[in-house]
Amino acid sequence: MKLYLVILVTSVALAAASPTRTKEEPIEDELLEALLSVEKSLFNEETTVMEKRSCVIGWKQRGQKCERDCECCGVAATCIGERMPGFCGYRTTNNNLGQYILYGYSTVSNGVSAILCAA
């Protein structure tokens, strides 16, 4: 019986000391606002055409012609094509594990390629 009372008192004390839900409301409001802005951008043609990029000026975007991997914009973007010039893009596979391995390989390959291109 004493153990039951200790558990009851402890659980009531923890419930009283726990943070209230009002602290999480601004975070939920920010997430809802972000979701609404993304939803609006899907229907707005101007925002869907323009993509946010953090590339150096002169790097090629996805689909543009290239000769080396270091010319393409993106961490794992590579110059794809049998003949020169190729085009910038991402190598893909249907297997999820294979896709992660391919992404890692492309990232390392681009790092080495960037060093060689800078030299």
UniProtKB/Swiss-Prot annotation:
Compartments (UniProt record): Secreted
Tissues expressing the protein: Expressed by the venom gland.
Propeptide residues according to the Swiss-Prot or TrEMBL record: 18-53
This protein's UniProt keywords: Cleavage on pair of basic residues, Disulfide bond, Ion channel impairing toxin, Knottin, Secreted, Signal, Toxin
Keyword Signal appears in the UniProt entry: yes
Keyword Acetylation: no
One Gene Ontology CC term in the entry: extracellular region
Signal peptide positions on this chain: 1-17
Disulfide bonds: C55-C73, C66-C79, C70-C117, C72-C88
A single GO molecular function term of this UniProt record: ion channel regulator activity
Domain notes: The presence of a 'disulfide through disulfide knot' structurally defines this protein as a knottin.
Family listed: Belongs to the neurotoxin 03 (Tx2) family. 03 subfamily.
Job description of the protein: Probable ion channel inhibitor.
Annotated protein name in UniProt: U9-hexatoxin-Hi1
Annotated organism of origin: Hadronyche infensa
